[in-house]
Amino acid sequence: LSYFKWNNSVKFLDKYLEQKKQRNLEGKETPLPPKFIMEILDNAFIEEDENLQEIWAQLLINWQDPEKVLDRKYMYIDILKNMSPIEVKMLEIISHSVDYNEVKNNENSYYCKDSVLKCIPMSDNEYEIMMLNLFRLGCCESHRIPNSGVMMGNMPIIPNLGTKQFRITALGYNLIESCIKK
C-alpha cells in the first residue's frame, strides 16, 4: 500500500509540475490553505485512475493560478472525491462541447441521455446510476418543464424528465471551471 501511494505521488507530481510549467506559473502560485492542499494531495495519491489523477492536478493548478477567478471552496474537493471516472469523463466531454457556453447561459437548454450514450457507451443502468450520483452531488439536475399547466390548488406542478434530460447546475459548472477547464 505504501509503495502504491508513493508511486502515485510521483506520477501526480510529474503531472502537476508539467502543467505548472506549461502555464508558466512557477513562482506565481496563489497560496492555498494547508487543509485544501493536504486533502487534494491525499486524494490524488490514492487515486488509481490516471484521468482522475490528472483532474486532481488540474484542480490544484487552477486554484493556484493568480489569473483565474475561481470559487475556491472545500466542497469541490469533497464532490470530486465522490465522483467516478465515468462521471468526470461526462463533465469533461460537456466542457469541451461547442455549445458549452450557450447551454450554460440558457436555462431552457439541456443535455439528453442519447447524446451522452453516443459519447460514452454504457448500459442504461450504468447511465442511471451515474446521473443519480451527479444529482446527489448537486452537479446536475433533471430538466424541468415550466408552465405545464398542471396545478395543485394554487401551486403549479413542474414535471421533470428524470435522468433522460438534464442540466448542469451552477455548482457543476463551478466544478468544471475549477478542475476540468484549463
Could you tell me what each predicted segment is?
Residues 95, 99, 135, 139, ...:
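Hydrophobic/aromatic-lined pockets within catalytic cores
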Residues 71-120:
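Short amphipathic alpha-helical interface segments
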Residues 38, 48-63, 141-182:
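Accessory beta->alpha helical hairpin/"wing" motif in late/C-terminal subdomains of nucleic-acid enzymes
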Residues 31-35, 117-153, 161-163:
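Short amphipathic alpha-helical interaction segments
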Residues 96, 130-134, 172:
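Compact DNA/chromatin-associated regulatory and scaffold domains in nuclear/nucleoid proteins
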Residues 75-79, 130, 171:
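Short, hydrophobic/aromatic alpha-helical segments in well-folded domains
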Residues 1-83:
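Charged, alpha-helical interface segments at or near domain boundaries
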